[in-house]
């Protein structure tokens, strides 16, 4: 899907939610880009609807990785290469075995 010249992919496991390589999240249900909200650890979260009145918390960096970064070894964590938790660009993310501290 292309919106304003930016390519988006469906976030696996979420209907009607798409994410760009830059970390922008689009809700087809609401027809708008969602704003990420920082949690107490500094990660940006979105709150997609997964049912009639149910919301799910999802970190934006995980949505980017699920949609854009292959994970053939089924690694569980997504790491920010530059340690900036708000830089959710696909080029800044990597699947890892354990979260690097």
Question: Where are each of the predicted segments found?
Answer:
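Conserved recognition-core residues within compact binding domains
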Residues: 1-78, 82-101
């Amino acid at each position: 899907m292309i919106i304003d010249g930016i390519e988006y992919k469906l976030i696996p496991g979420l209907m009607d939610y798409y994410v760009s390589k830059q970390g922008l999240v689009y809700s087809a249900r609401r027809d708008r880009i969602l704003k990420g909200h920082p949690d107490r650890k500094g990660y940006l979260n979105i709150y997609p609807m997964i049912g009639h009145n149910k919301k799910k918390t999802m970190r934006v960096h995980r949505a980017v990785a699920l949609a854009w970064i292959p994970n053939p070894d089924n690694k569980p964590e997504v790491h920010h290469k530059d340690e900036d938790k708000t830089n959710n660009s696909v080029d800044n993310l990597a699947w890892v075995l354990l979260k690097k501290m």
